[in-house]
Amino acid sequence: MAAPKLGFFEKIANLTGALYRHQHAQFPRRFAILKAVGKHELAPPRQADWPAIKADWAKVQSFIQTGGYKNLSIREGLVYTAVTLEVVFWFFVGEMIGRRYIFGYLVPADYVSKSTKKTVKEQEALAALEN
């Protein structure tokens, strides 16, 4: 007896199951690698790292001041530009995460700052003295 021909969705289901079983078997190893890399890369700098950080920053400053960027190849320039843009974009993403809103800080419509309230009181006091 011949095996029945599988339909499109049955093939997709079988493929998805095979991928899931493979990924499920690989997960512990990959999670351990991710955890080790995250622990190393996301840790704040140690006291011993500061001299190297200062030296690297001095190199960047001298590179900019001496115009060393003019001698870069197109490829190097594009790579440095891409890295700089990535840092800037992640800064803005962090800002959005920090304020928990995409477009700006949520300020209530009836919010009045303390300095504005103080100014209004002063103006009302002056108006009362004039009358």
Swiss-Prot record:
InterPro entries: ATP_synth_F0_gsu_mt
Location(s), subcellular: Mitochondrion membrane
Tagged with keyword Ribonucleoprotein: no
UniProt GO BP: proton motive force-driven ATP synthesis
GO annotations of cellular component type: mitochondrial membrane; mitochondrion; non-motile cilium; proton-transporting ATP synthase complex
Taxonomic superkingdom: Eukaryota
Coiled coil: none
Pfam families: ATP-synt_G
Molecular-function GO term, any one: proton transmembrane transporter activity
Keyword Mitochondrion: yes
Keywords on record: ATP synthesis, CF(0), Hydrogen ion transport, Ion transport, Membrane, Mitochondrion, Transport
SUBUNIT field: Subunit of the F-type ATPase which has 2 components, CF(1) - the catalytic core - and CF(0) - the membrane proton channel.
UniProt similarity note: Belongs to the ATPase g subunit family.
Function according to Swiss-Prot or TrEMBL: Mitochondrial membrane ATP synthase (F(1)F(0) ATP synthase or Complex V) produces ATP from ADP in the presence of a proton gradient across the membrane which is generated by electron transport complexes of the respiratory chain. F-type ATPases consist of two structural domains, F(1) - containing the extramembraneous catalytic core, and F(0) - containing the membrane proton channel, linked together by a central stalk and a peripheral stalk. During catalysis, ATP synthesis in the catalytic domain of F(1) is coupled via a rotary mechanism of the central stalk subunits to proton translocation.
Name this protein carries in UniProt: Probable ATP synthase subunit g 2, mitochondrial
